[in-house]
Amino acid sequence: MNKKSIWSKTAFGSLFLLLGTAFTACSNYDFQANLTSLNQLRTSANKDINLTQDKNTLIDALKTAFENNSEGTTKVLLDAWKFSLYDAKILEKQDPVKFVKAFGSGKSKEDIEPSAGVRGLRFVERFGDNTASLIKNAILLDQQKVEVFNIRFKSSRDFTIQIKLNAKGNYKKSEVEKYKSQIGVQDNELGDKEEGTLEADLIFTYTPPASNLFSKSNFDKLTKSINFNTNLKLEMVGKDEVMRKILNSSAFTNNLASVNYPNQAVNLLPYVLYSIL
């Protein structure tokens, strides 16, 4: 083998190592060593658009941060959730460009957790598709405002997150009666008014699940998600006479006023993206 060939292989190897080192350096972010605030993420996102343009890059970076400081990183993820709902008020009005980048095309506030929609209230999970559709037509709570978002987090085994939504909407007596006839109930609880307004407070309380606690395995590039596992208690409090009648009628919604849902996963990645875009 001549000297030129040896030099070429050596030079190529050195160049490969140099490029590899440079790539590794570019892939490291300041916040990964000790993530403690949402502003650290925002600062890095302003310096490197890959964090907001490539979800897998963001997931990898946050996973490394979690491995170095699980408590601090989890608190930041939860803070991003709170910021998106409480400060940015995405249930009331979304920035359309940011929302598509964070949640994906074809998504709506039905995909926000929590919400007063069919998905947020777990109507399908509780009653099935057909009944859920009937309830949706009977009770439409389409105006939502987050009034309280409290986070108490010590570890994945010890946390409480409570979110209170005020929801307003409308009902149509004909649709309510249609639902009640489906379940064999005949009464006149709503009086003679054909339609009217509704208002309720919805209280979502998230606590640790019995198993599958939040860990680095929940940072999933395949599904592009960071799933935070919880048990959910959902309570509805009627703020007007009609809503109170509906919630107090076990025949109408099978005690919808207070329901427990185990093993509920909240994908925190869209809220992180929305809060740093």
Swiss-Prot record:
Residues 1-25 form the signal peptide. One of its GO terms (cellular component) is plasma membrane. It holds the Pfam family Lipoprotein_3. The keyword Aminoacyl-tRNA synthetase does not apply. A lipid is attached at residue 26 (S-diacylglycerol cysteine). It is a lipid-anchor. It is found in: Cell membrane. It comes from the Bacteria. The keyword Signal applies. A lipid is attached at residue 26 (N-palmitoyl cysteine). Its main location: membrane. Keywords: Cell membrane, Lipoprotein, Membrane, Palmitate, Signal. Belongs to the MG439/MG440 family. This is Uncharacterized lipoprotein MG440 homolog 1.
